[in-house]
Each structure stands twice: as C-alpha cells, then as structure tokens.
Amino acid sequence: MRIINAEGLILGRLASRVAKMLLEGEEVVIVNAEKAVITGNREVIFSKYKQRTGLRTLTNPRRGPFYPKRSDEIVRRTIRGMLPWKTDRGRKAFKRLKVYVGIPKEFKDKQLETIVEAHVSRLSRPKYVTVGEVAKFLGGKF
C-alpha cells in the first residue's frame, strides 16, 4: 500500500501517476486531498467547476451527471477520469483508491510519499488554487 501526501502537488499530474499505480494493481491512499493544487487562472477554474455542478438532464434531472463538491471527492473523480471506468479492470482499480481530507489517525505514524514531478514548485508561473478553496467555493464541507 502506498500512502501519498497530496500537499502542494498538481492535481492532474498526481492523478495520472496514481491512475497508473492503480492499474498496476497497487493500493493507493491519498491524504491531505484539500491541499492539492489546480493550476491556472482562479476565475476560470471557479467558473469551470461551478458550471459542472449545474449540469443536468432536461428529461430527468435526477439522472446526472453528478459532480462532487467535497475536496476528497473532487480528487477521486479526477483520478476516475484517468481510468478505464467503463471496464471491469478500471472499476476494480478504482476500488483500490482511498482519498482523505487531512491525515487520519491510522496513517499518522506511517511514512508518507510524495511525487516530486508533480510538485507545484516546478511551475515557472505559480498561478494556482487549492482543491480546498474550490470545494469551499462550491459549498462543500471541507
């Protein structure tokens, strides 16, 4: 089992690396999901996520698609988009993923990994928003 600290990691790069690990059969736990980073212009990011939450089907609005508002679920959904979700292999891989806000008690004393290639310090122009800020904007709990 790999425990990855998402603090200061770019969400898309983190998601692609984690999706690869999941497809290889590893169990992955992500902690500090609210501290992951989405790069780009703040207003554009907020408008994109706000537009997603308003999507619905005109015939039956209860059918979806449903987009998350909590920060841990935003990270899970991003990783799900990089897996072959409609196949049995992709669904089994997705079940091996756990995402947490903060660090739970059972992982406090464990060794946390980070992904150096996905760190925000590698950006030349540091324009970004944390996943926690996006979740707060959408009305999520965390």
UniProtKB/Swiss-Prot annotation:
Q: Which GO terms describe its molecular function?
A: mRNA binding; structural constituent of ribosome
Q: Which SUPFAM superfamilies has this protein been placed in?
A: Ribosomal protein L13
Q: Is the keyword Membrane in the record?
A: no
What PANTHER family does UniProt report for this protein, alphabetically? LARGE RIBOSOMAL SUBUNIT PROTEIN UL13 (PTHR11545:SF3), RIBOSOMAL PROTEIN L13 (PTHR11545)
The free-text function statement in the UniProt record for this protein reads: This protein is one of the early assembly proteins of the 50S ribosomal subunit, although it is not seen to bind rRNA by itself. It is important during the early stages of 50S assembly.
Q: How does it assemble?
A: Part of the 50S ribosomal subunit.
| Designated name of the protein | Large ribosomal subunit protein uL13
Q: Gene that codes for this?
A: rpl13
